[in-house]
Amino acid sequence: MQENNLPLTLVVDVLLAAAVNNTSIEHECSSLEGAPSANTIRGVLRSSLELQQLERQVNQALWAHLNPRHWKGLQKVAVDLVEVPYHGLAAKNLDEIRRGQAKQGTTHFHVFATVYVVRQHRRVTLALHYVRQGESLVSVLDALKSWLDELGIQVGLWLADRAFCSVAALRWFSKQPEAIVPMVARGSKASLSGSRGLFASKQSYWDKYTMHSETDGALTFDVAVVHRYSKPSRSAAKRLPPTTLVYAVVGKRLQRQRIRRSFASLVEAYRRRFGIESSYRQINQARLRTSSRSPELRLLAVAIALLLRNLWTLCRWMTLLGSSPGRPCGDSAFRFRTLLRWISRMVETRLALHTAIELSVPSPTKF
């Protein structure tokens, strides 16, 4: 990644500054005295980035800090789709943009699939995959699992987003050790047909459910209907009403083993997956902004945010470690925002921040 003898470290510094400050390459190049022009940076990226190669390099970078000895045995893994709203046309191929439910005034998105592991209070992103229009969920899952296989991660439990609640995806999960996927209420509200009838239950129980698809046929699987009461919140004036959660539970493990799992443990196992939602909020704090149509630059923006999130997880774990082995104790004052500020100050020290504006004509001292 070098053009016009431009050092790689200079390109990285500008990208990091744009990411940690939630700004664009254009803004950082105009704000830093030692930065080249934004067109130069974009030219280097345009000539250096290729989508498939970039995806592999990103995943290798995500793995770089992992110690294989700490990730032996079966892992609990969360899989999700990240939709970045897009208001524009595709750069080269129409399949770069994937359609979905309306969000932020558009139905067009750049979509990324991620695999995320939670172990001993460490939440780490292991792989990223660029999802194209028309790519099936099974193909997405195959791609993510191939990255995990290459890393040597063995998955004992898949925790998937409700977007994966389809016949094809559940059939894929049924060939894995075990998977928990929340179901979506479908059917008539009046007659409580379809899966909507499960959500109307006032008690917890196991049941069988058959899902139909015009393209993928029918699939019968176990469902856990969990009727639970929420714990009272300090801020809430009164106790929240009870809710009914419905999970599809599939996999190669025996049905008896699955039913032995208590409803509380099932909800707790899936609740840990919600760490991925807070991680995405933090990712948005560290994602550089761009109006470029380039899918490579869009992927790079998400990748930098994921790498920074992983770096913070590693640093925070180190600050929480005590003198004795085991899980860390207490809380840490080392916040994600703190890491972003440090990186911003580091780049400003290297490249010098513009602190004055040159005026072409004398300016009045009063309005």
Predicted regions and their residues:
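Short, conserved catalytic/metal-binding motifs centered on acidic residues
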Residues: 14, 28-29, 37, 41, ...
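Long, charge-rich low-complexity segments
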Residues: 48, 53-64, 345-367
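An internal, acidic/charged active-site-proximal segment
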Residues: 128-240, 324-336, 361-365
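Basic, amphipathic alpha-helical segments enriched in Lys/Arg and hydrophobic/aromatic residues
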Residues: 289-346
